[in-house]
Amino acid sequence: MNIKERMLLREKFYSPYATKDKESIRLIPLEEDIRPNFFRDIDRIIHSTSYTRYMDKTQVFSLKDNDNISKRMVHVQLVSKIARTIGRALSLNEDLIEAAALGHDLGHVPFGHEGERILNKISLKHNEGYFNHNVQSVRELMDIENDGEGINLSIQTLDAILCHNGELELKEYHPKKKTTEEFLQDYE
């Protein structure tokens, strides 16, 4: 039994709501290797230039030095840990959860949410629609990384990053299975 087969054994204990590795959808198929699909998404994100940029960014902005203000990298790692713990308790795919958590803030602009609010006002004023960091995160991963080629993450990982605050906007919160066609329509 190889590494991938051992890692995928845990899928037999997944909840019916969990996404299995074989359900992974990519715009460009990958050659098989020893890692499960969503684990590969984790690797692609942590080796991306966008993720490296987390290194020296603060999660919140302060005009004073403050040791209690964490770096965005620490925030993302804490979100990942908490999300995986919840995912484990609910018998979900922890690799998919980790990939989404690690990529969820890649599209943040300088000055965090306040910078996003300012850009949103400017964008709306010029009839360009809303400016949302989650949309920018997906754009970064699909259209900017790798000299504009993107890093070919699974549609499920991209969808989780895109919708990471969807319950706030839609005022609902429940799992919804999607077909391949529904996933791809979201990205046209």
What are these regions (language model features)?
Residues 34, 68-76, 107-108, 126-130:
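Short secondary-structure transition/capping motifs
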